[in-house]
């Protein structure tokens, strides 16, 4: 295996072992059509006889609304988007389990003015309708188990924040409890409280011992529900930071008994690396099982608004929901969608280095192309770190394809900045893998009918800028 431009690449294989989780989709409802990413079988051949190949990496699905304004997306559309983005949730949630949903409800006010945030689609906190849709899906899969919604707001009390943002039984049926971390982790500074679990982490990078809420730590499934936003502390905040910073018990790690803010538990200076090491450690002590990102609005220069004016001007109007079982993969795609190099994000680097997760070659994005969604999110203090992406085009691509029975033979040449290749036949996924500058891929496709078929080759650089070519064979 060779390393080119920060990407792992390998020569094309005669018998690919990777496969898809599902075909790129166009959405469940006409109300949220998603741009086609692959050609349809316009010749009318029997494309349904072709089977998807297998993909053993991580899949991140993006559902994109076609509404011009995020504020116009309805509750019904939001549920359809969540169902599309979390279509593989059934592989994680089973009946009889204890499931914890952890939305980001950081606070309900603008720091500088004290004014209240919008209750819906504000970009800072997770819209209650997103969490409601997740709760509904979980209950369908898990009617007999326990489902809790849990949060520890930075500026509390969390109970008031939940009530303001409609996180109550009146708005969300089916939850067994709405748990506020400062209420459900024992008394102030009681590290031996029965509601708390002490976790030893011998390989911890910052500390060797961490404390968790017992229900969270012992849950069968933890689903992180962050918003899509940038923050000077970690550049991009996503599914991992949402639990690593949002779930440490406020009564243990908070500033004071009446202040659950966890700013004192760890340095938030990205330059000294403490925050990244804390995020890494806390996540490794209790990884999440699924991530669903509320990107309906998106927000730059977070984690909260800087002023009354920027409460509105820093909204990004993204109109997306993202989901996946691999939090490192989801956060990597979040960084690329918001215009930041994932290799400049400290906690993601630590996770890649220590777990081998998050390599683009092993991530498949369904639903919408990253480079077509990308917007340039700013952060408050760029001097603290992070590399913002510049506008770029996909790698160069020349390709030819031929057929011998059920076997396709594809020759291609691409630029040295190419990182990965995907191949579709009649719109059905067949291959994903690393890329070499001058390669050949042979695919055996049982059921490939007689007649003309469309083969699409897509190559990406490590920022998921793409170039595609369609060939009739």
Q: Which residues does each PLM region occupy?
A:
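Edge beta-strands of extracellular beta-sandwich domains
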Residues: 466-473
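N-terminal export leaders
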Residues: 1-3
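N-terminal and secondary-structure boundary signal
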Residues: 7-13, 18-412, 416-420, 425-433, ...
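Surface-exposed, short loops/turns at beta-strand junctions within beta-sandwich domains
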Residues: 444-452
């Amino acid at each position: 295996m060779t390393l080119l431009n920060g990407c792992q690449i390998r020569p094309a294989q005669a018998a690919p072992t990777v496969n898809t989780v599902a075909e790129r989709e166009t959405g469940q409802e006409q109300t949220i059509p998603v741009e086609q990413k692959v050609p349809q079988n316009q010749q009318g051949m029997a494309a349904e006889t072709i089977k998807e190949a297998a993909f053993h990496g991580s899949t991140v699905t993006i559902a994109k609304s076609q509404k011009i304004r995020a504020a116009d997306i309805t509750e019904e559309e939001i549920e359809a988007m969540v169902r599309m983005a979390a279509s593989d949730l059934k592989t994680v949630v089973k009946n009889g389990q204890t499931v914890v949903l952890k939305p980001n409800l950081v606070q309900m006010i603008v720091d500088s003015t004290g004014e209240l945030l919008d209750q819906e689609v504000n970009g800072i906190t997770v819209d209650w309708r997103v969490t409601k849709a997740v709760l509904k899906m979980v209950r369908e899969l898990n009617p007999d188990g326990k489902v809790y919604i849990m949060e520890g707001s930075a500026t509390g009390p969390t109970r008031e924040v939940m009530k303001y943002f409609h996180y109550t039984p009146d708005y969300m049926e089916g939850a067994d409890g709405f748990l506020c971390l400062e209420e459900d982790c024992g008394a102030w500074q009681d590290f031996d409280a029965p509601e708390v679990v002490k976790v030893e982490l011998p390989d911890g990078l910052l500390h060797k011992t961490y404390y968790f809420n017992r229900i969270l730590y012992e849950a069968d499934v933890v689903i992180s529900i962050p918003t899509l936003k940038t923050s000077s502390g970690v550049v991009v905040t996503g599914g991992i930071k949402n639990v690593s910073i949002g779930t440490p018990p406020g009564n243990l790690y908070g500033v004071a008994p009446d202040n659950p803010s966890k700013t004192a538990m760890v340095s938030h200076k990205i330059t000294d690396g403490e925050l990244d090491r804390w995020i890494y450690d806390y996540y490794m002590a209790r990884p999440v099982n699924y991530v669903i990102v509320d990107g309906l609005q998106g927000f730059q220069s977070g984690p909260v608004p800087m002023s009354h004016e920027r409460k509105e001007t820093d909204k990004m109007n993204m109109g997306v929901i993202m989901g996946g079982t691999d939090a490192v993969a989801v956060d990597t795609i979040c960084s690329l969608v918001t215009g930041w190099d994932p290799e400049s994000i400290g906690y993601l680097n630590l996770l890649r280095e220590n777990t081998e997760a998050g390599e683009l070659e092993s991530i498949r994005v369904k639903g919408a192309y990253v480079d077509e969604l990308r917007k340039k999110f700013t952060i408050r203090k760029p001097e603290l770190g992070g590399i913002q992406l510049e506008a770029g085009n996909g790698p160069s691509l020349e390709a030819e394809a031929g057929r011998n029975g059920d076997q396709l033979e594809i020759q291609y040449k691409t630029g040295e900045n190419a990182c990965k290749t995907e191949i579709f036949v009649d719109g059905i996924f067949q291959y994903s893998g690393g890329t070499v500058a001058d390669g050949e891929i042979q695919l055996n496709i049982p059921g490939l009918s007689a007649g003309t078929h469309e083969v699409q080759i897509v190559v990406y650089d490590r920022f998921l800028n793409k170039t595609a070519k369609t060939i009739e064979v």
